[in-house]
Amino acid sequence: MAKNQNQGQIAEHSARRYLEQRGLTFVEQNVRYRFGEIDIVMKDGSDWVFVEVKYRSPSQYGGAVNALSQAQTLRIRKAASHYIQINRIDAICRFDVVAVDPDAMQWIRDAF
């Protein structure tokens, strides 16, 4: 397994635990479609939460919170839309980002 892929999996696991400790309920992880991927699907009460986890090492410019491009958000929205449709979800949904840096974790609700 590549080092970056392993770090990404560790970051996703840490983000999941972090959100569960804050009251969210885990539903599914690494949901992949040909046009996009959802890192983590969770529920916050009756609301559905699609979580993008971003990891950056300290040497990478801008940190994890700045690592999400407009093209990436579009792919995530597309994947979430498909997920909502195939699972017949009729509830409030939001997109959160958990930015994981080696020294800190930042949870951004309604990030995009």
Swiss-Prot record:
MF (Gene Ontology): nucleic acid binding
InterPro entries: Restrct_endonuc-II-like, tRNA_endonuc-like_dom_sf, UPF0102_YraN-like
CDD domains in UniProt: PoNe_Nuclease (cd20736)
PANTHER family, per database record: UPF0102 PROTEIN YRAN
Family: Belongs to the UPF0102 family.
Protein name (database record): UPF0102 protein Spea_0251
Lineage: Bacteria, Pseudomonadati, Pseudomonadota, Gammaproteobacteria, Alteromonadales
